[in-house]
């Protein structure tokens, strides 16, 4: 770790929603905001940081171009509008960045692009190479090609996956409020700001995020930002929520982050007992004393506890085609420090239809004395795996010892249902 006096350089992802870039009523671009964002990103680059933008707005710009007031309902129409708008949107970014002689690159992703491990690594290598070349990658979901079943869902999720993909230090989620509140500040004047969240896995007691379903031109809301924060912090990425119409504050917040020691954040995380109240008071006084703009920071899991590259890919890059229900003993064996692979003896039930090496959810159930699944025991989804066997093969060998596989199937492709490198569980 660098000394406190040394300048720290970060990899920073900035996510901008459609409502940050396009007026919800007129559908006109917010060129002033875009210009401020460009100035901020250029300044961050000059400070030595690497920056990636995740930019929504292609569909919104397409609606404006085609003089349409509402988002179409049919998928083909939406994809056509996205194709029209995406070119114009990247053109605006290019024009603004060119005023500073800053080069950009467009990266359009679909979930299909990262379903394969080799493609996932290729995407990772491409973005990192662009950063090393001093280029600003501008990432968006390819709404022209992606289908509903395998979409990222929203660009909050895409920004979290992008952050994990490149091992970013910080993810900034820009929105229409300056931070997370205990309630909607527009409708509840008593809503209190939440400035730091040490551990999202412990929940957010006293915080109501319902009702923030996103704008007319976008798909996100506060709940999707919390999902993104959970994904990113589990991958070791600090995540921040801040107001989009003051993008210059990103630089001020980054300068503040440079003064912090890693131990300071770890101490806050370790001392956190689920009570947010006192913590917010201390954080508010600290930000006020240093004249740091309001924002919410979700502290990332440390290096020992965050998801590694392949684990994150399995959990969040792959789409589950079914589920494998295991007993509690198998789960304990899979999650200990030197975890083992999943053996057929630990499998109680198989759900859905899937092929070899497709992704499945791992669920924990209770085994009855006859070896079948207890229907009264609530199943808990605990992770994901890439299976060495199809669902029909696994149905035949579930509960058996590995040396019985060949007798049952006539062949033995592997003693494991899933090898340990093809298993992933969220940090506990």
Curated annotation (Swiss-Prot):
Keyword Kinase listed? The answer is yes
**Protein name as it appears in the record:** Glutamate 5-kinase
Which InterPro entries does this UniProt record tie to the protein?
AceGlu_kinase-like_sf, Asp/Glu/Uridylate_kinase, G5K_ProB, Glu/AcGlu_kinase, Glu_5kinase, Glu_5kinase/COase_Synthase, Glutamate_5-kinase_CS, PUA
The family note in this entry says: Belongs to the glutamate 5-kinase family.
Gene Ontology CC terms, in alphabetical order: cytoplasm; cytosol
Q: Where is the PUA domain?
A: 321-412
- Organism of origin is Saccharomyces cerevisiae (strain ATCC 204508 / S288c)
Catalyzed chemical reaction(s):
L-glutamate + ATP = L-glutamyl 5-phosphate + ADP
Please give the coiled-coil regions recorded for this protein: none
Q: Give the enzyme's EC designation.
A: 2.7.2.11
**Disulfide bridge positions per record:** none
Its encoding gene is what?
PRO1
| Leftover remarks | Present with 10400 molecules/cell in log phase SD medium.
Phylogenetic lineage: Eukaryota, Fungi, Dikarya, Ascomycota, Saccharomycotina
- NCBIfam families to which the protein is assigned, alphabetical: proB
Which SUPFAM superfamilies does UniProt cross-reference here? Carbamate kinase-like (SSF53633), PUA domain-like (SSF88697)
């Amino acid at each position: 770790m660098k000394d406190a006096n040394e300048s720290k350089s970060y990899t920073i992802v900035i996510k901008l929603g459609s409502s940050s870039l396009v007026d919800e009523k007129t559908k006109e671009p917010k060129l002033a905001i875009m210009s401020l964002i460009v100035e901020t990103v250029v300044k961050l680059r000059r400070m030595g940081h690497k920056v990636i933008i995740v930019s929504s707005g292609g569909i919104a710009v397409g609606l404006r171009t085609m003089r349409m007031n509402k988002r179409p309902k049919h998928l083909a129409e939406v994809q056509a509008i996205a194709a029209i708008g995406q070119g114009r949107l990247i053109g605006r970014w290019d024009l603004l960045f060119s005023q500073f002689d800053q080069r950009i690159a467009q990266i359009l992703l679909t979930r299909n692009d990262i379903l394969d491990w080799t493609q996932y690594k290729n995407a990772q290598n491409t973005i990192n190479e662009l950063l090393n070349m001093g280029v600003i990658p501008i990432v968006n979901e390819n709404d022209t090609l992606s289908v509903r079943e395998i979409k990222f869902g929203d660009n909050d999720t895409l920004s979290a996956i992008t952050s994990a993909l490149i091992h970013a230090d910080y993810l900034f989620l820009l929105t229409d409020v300056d931070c997370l509140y205990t309630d909607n500040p527009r409708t509840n004047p008593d809503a209190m700001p939440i400035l730091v969240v040490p551990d999202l896995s412990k929940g957010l007691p006293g915080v109501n995020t319902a009702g923030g379903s996103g704008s007319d031109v976008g798909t996100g809301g506060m709940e999707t930002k919390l999902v993104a924060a959970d994904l990113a912090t589990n991958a070791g990425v600090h995540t921040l929520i801040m107001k989009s119409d003051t993008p210059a504050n990103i630089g001020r917040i980054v300068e503040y982050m440079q003064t912090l020691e890693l131990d300071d954040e770890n101490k806050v995380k370790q001392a956190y007992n689920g009570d947010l109240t006192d913590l917010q008071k201390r954080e508010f006084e600290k930000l006020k004393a240093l004249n740091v703009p309001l924002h919410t920071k979700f502290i990332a899991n440390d290096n020992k506890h965050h998801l590694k590259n392949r684990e994150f890919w399995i959990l969040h890059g792959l789409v589950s085609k079914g589920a494998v229900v295991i007993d509690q003993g198998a789960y304990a064996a899979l999650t200990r420090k030197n975890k083992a692979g999943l053996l057929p003896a630990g499998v109680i039930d198989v759900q859905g239809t899937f092929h070899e090496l497709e992704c499945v959810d791992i669920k924990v159930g209770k085994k009855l004395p006859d070896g079948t699944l207890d229907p009264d025991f609530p199943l808990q989804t605990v992770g994901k795996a890439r299976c060495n066997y199809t669902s029909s093969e696994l149905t035949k060998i579930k509960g058996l010892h590995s040396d019985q596989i060949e007798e049952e199937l006539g062949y033995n492709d592997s003693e494991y249902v899933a090898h340990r490198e093809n298993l992933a569980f969220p940090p506990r």
